[in-house]
Amino acid sequence: YAGDTILYKKGKPVKTWWGPEPRIAFRYAIDGQQSIKAGFSMNYQYVHLVSSSNSTLPTDIWVPSSKWVEPQRGLQYSLGYFRNFKDNSYEFSAEFYYKDLKNQIEFSEDFIQELGQEVEMGYVFGDGWSYGMELFAKKSKGKFNGWLGYTLSYTWRRFDDLNSGNKFPARYDRRHDISLNLVYEINDKLSLGGTWVYAT
């Protein structure tokens, strides 16, 4: 078989990517027990997990950003309310978030790699977004303490070349997530604890 092959010397740069990652946090204290927090962050990811659902064989591969694959970018916005009770023995918070995702990557629906064919020929690129809320309650004082958390989240992807251009749930979408952690302090040196997690 004769084909075009590109070889790079060890340590030779192929493509250079960079991006700013600003983070902004804001807190407003209503009083000594209540506060409101808001935040914004921008993040880049330069290594990507590419998945395919049209094959019976494992096709999840990690690929770096390159001349053909741009870095993934995420913008996240958050807003939360925080409250302490009874001399900070109890804590409660409710947070809402929205995340905008660019340059998401998947395999095309009909891609089957042939001998000598660059795997990059099977990539398709699109956008994603996720949003939801997180509720959290914690008891931190006393012999019996612990915390309870609940997360409701929606994670979507949309590609022009997948699912007729319609949005679809991301592979790792977890709509509901409940976590419970309990600890009982028998004495200063011994305690019993347990954790329960439910996710859909």
Regions found by a protein language model. Give the residues of each.
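Hydrophobic, lipid-facing positions within transmembrane beta-strands of outer-membrane proteins
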Residues: 20-26, 36, 65, 75-79, ...
